[in-house]
């Protein structure tokens, strides 16, 4: 999956770090969580850049808001991944109808499926089907950290899957 995010994310972690210090827990678990979030974002970006270099393709981050079905980008994990792509010289294109980011590629691209409504809202008990915000051309490379997407006409990478087969 993707790292956590949202506008409350920094504030919540500051409060949790303060609590850990006040309770003298002896270890700042919350700092470690924040560090792991950064490292994972950079690793995903490096994966996208590797495929973009290898296939000479544009990087498209499918989902810009901090979670599906909202327009808010504060604390967006997608933007953090995009930042690390830019550090490597690749400016990603974002596609997310609720943030006003429209894109309809005609050529194969490297896609990051950053949103999964079915995973994000599973706890509600309401069926939230995953939907694509744009066409994914045949021959594209699709990086899916949720490990749900299937498309025989694309190279699909279920990112983070350590159980092959």
Label for each model-derived stretch:
Residues 1-165:
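Structural/interface elements that position substrates and couple domains in central-metabolism enzymes
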């Amino acid at each position: 999956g993707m790292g956590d995010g949202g506008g409350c994310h920094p504030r919540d972690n500051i409060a949790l770090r303060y609590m850990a210090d006040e309770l003298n827990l002896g270890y700042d678990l919350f700092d470690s969580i924040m560090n792991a979030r950064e490292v994972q974002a950079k690793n995903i970006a490096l994966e996208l850049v590797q495929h973009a270099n290898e296939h000479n393709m544009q990087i498209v981050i499918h989902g810009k808001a901090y979670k599906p079905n909202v327009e808010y980008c504060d604390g967006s994990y997608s933007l953090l991944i995009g930042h690390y792509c830019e550090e490597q010289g690749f400016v990603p294109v974002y596609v997310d109808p609720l943030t006003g980011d429209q894109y309809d590629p005609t050529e194969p691209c490297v896609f990051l499926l950053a949103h999964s409504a079915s995973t994000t809202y599973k706890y509600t008990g309401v069926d939230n089907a995953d939907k694509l915000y744009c066409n994914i051309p045949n021959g594209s490379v699709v990086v899916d950290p949720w490990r749900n997407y299937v498309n025989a006409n694309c190279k699909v990478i279920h990112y983070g899957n350590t159980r092959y087969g």
